[in-house]
Swiss-Prot record:
Role of this protein: Nucleoside triphosphate pyrophosphatase that hydrolyzes dTTP and UTP. May have a dual role in cell division arrest and in preventing the incorporation of modified nucleotides into cellular nucleic acids.
Keywords: Cytoplasm, Hydrolase, Nucleotide metabolism
PANTHER family in UniProt: BIFUNCTIONAL DTTP/UTP PYROPHOSPHATASE/METHYLTRANSFERASE PROTEIN-RELATED (PTHR43213), BIFUNCTIONAL DTTP_UTP PYROPHOSPHATASE_METHYLTRANSFERASE PROTEIN-RELATED (PTHR43213:SF5)
Gene Ontology biological process: nucleotide metabolic process
EC number: 3.6.1.9
Keyword Cytoplasm tagged: yes
Site, Important for substrate specificity: residue positions: R12, T70, Q152
Name assigned to this protein: dTTP/UTP pyrophosphatase
HAMAP family: Maf
Spans traversing the lipid bilayer: none
Pfam entry (one): Maf
Species: Bacillus cereus (strain B4264)
């Protein structure tokens, strides 16, 4: 029987697959992520998700491989994971009191076909004080997250409004993924 392999070490993606009762194994993609000249954030996340999944699929061609990538954008500026605490603070100051977009791309690779898709979610932050930002960054939570915040953690208190898929902001649009997996004869809704 074919296995589902998650090409990611993200604990959040692992938790979401477990939440949906999707049986899977983890093989972390060691691919060097490269962003070419893409026209849109959706193209970027789908390309990065495909790069990750393709790298793992090379050695797992009999299985179904999932790759995913998430970025945050604000006024056409891409906000990935911060490289240090100062950059995290800058990102949070930029997002304070404003609406930004979160894009998560997913790639599903199997022998018979490859499917890519993305979800776009708008997130609005409350106005943040310098003290709130400093305290949050000192917690280290934002340092491994696109846009420097975790909506499922302490960063949740910054969110005033969300339009779209909450789980996509966490890192994996799980409801859409479950539906897309049906194309590969995987139906966890009847498990």
């Amino acid at each position: 029987m074919r296995k589902i392999i998650l090409a990611s070490g993200s604990p959040r993606r692992k938790e979401l697959l477990e939440l949906a009762s999707v049986p899977f194994e983890i093989v972390v993609s060691e691919v060097e992520e490269t962003i070419g000249a893409y026209s849109s954030p959706s193209d970027i996340v789908m390309s990065l998700a495909l790069q990750k999944a393709s790298a793992v699929a090379e050695n797992n061609s009999d299985h179904i491989v999932l790759g995913a990538d998430t970025i945050v954008t604000y006024e056409s500026r891409i906000l990935g994971k911060p490289s240090n605490e100062d950059e995290a603070k800058e990102m949070l100051q930029l997002l304070s009191g404003k609406t930004h977009e979160v894009y998560t791309g997913v790639a599903i690779i199997a022998k018979e076909k490859t499917v890519t898709f993305y979800e776009r979610t708008e997130v609005t932050f409350w106005e943040l004080t310098e003290e709130e930002i400093d305290t949050y960054v000192a917690s280290k939570e934002p340092l491994d997250k696109a846009g420097s915040y975790g909506i499922q953690g302490k960063g949740s208190i910054f969110v005033q409004n969300i339009q779209g898929d909450y789980y996509s902001v966490v890192g994996l649009p799980i409801a859409r993924l479950v539906r897309e997996l049906k194309q590969f004869d995987i139906d966890v809704t009847h498990a």
